[in-house]
Amino acid sequence: ANCQNIYHVLAAMGLPVTSDIATALYVGLSTDTGNFMYDNVSSETLRIAAELKDLGADTDSLRLKLYESCSKKKITMMKYILNNLHISDDGQYAWSSISHQMMTDLQPESTDIDGLINTIKDIEGVEIAILFRGVEEKRTKASLRSKVWADVNQIAGMFGGGGHVRASGVSIDGDVEYAAALLGPAVEEIIRQHNAAECK
C-alpha cells in the first residue's frame, strides 16, 4: 500500500505523525487491503496499522464510516445489481450490471459504488465476479474480483485493462450488455482450463 511507503518516508525523515496523519494513513492501509482481508496484507502492514493505532488513529470512527454505514443510493444500487445478477451454471462466475440510465438517474458518488462488487464476489462458490457500469451510453467500466486462484489482472489485460491479481478493471467501448458478452467467454475459458487442470 502507498500509505506504508509514506509512513516509512515520514519515519526516515524524523517527522512527527499526529493523530490526524495517523488516521489518514490508517484509512489508506484499510481501504487498500480490503480492511486487512486481501492477500496483499503482510506482517509489516499489520505492524504499521498497530503503530498508527498507538499514534492516535481514530479506528472506531473509521470503522463506522467505511464499513458500517451505507447511503440510500448505495442500497438502491445494491438492490439493482442483485435483481440483475447472473451466475454461471457451475456457480464459479457471477456478474451484474448497472445501466448507464440507472447511473444517470441516481448520480451516485464514488462511495456509493465502492464495495458493490463484493456483494457479488461474496456469493458462496463464486471465484470470479464482475460488475459492469455504464459510464456513458456506449462506454462501460468493468470491475473484476477473484477469491482464491483466478488472476483477474490477466483477464482485464486481454481487453486493455489491468490492476492486481485479485482486483482489476477495464473500460470497454460499448454498453453493459456488449461488455458482458465480450468478457464472459474469456472468464468461462479461464475457469474451464483451471477445472481441467484440477482434474488431472
Model regions and ranges:
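Hydrophobic helix-and-loop "lid/oligomerization" segment in the mid-to-C-terminal part
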Residues: 31-200
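Short alpha-helices
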Residues: 1-48
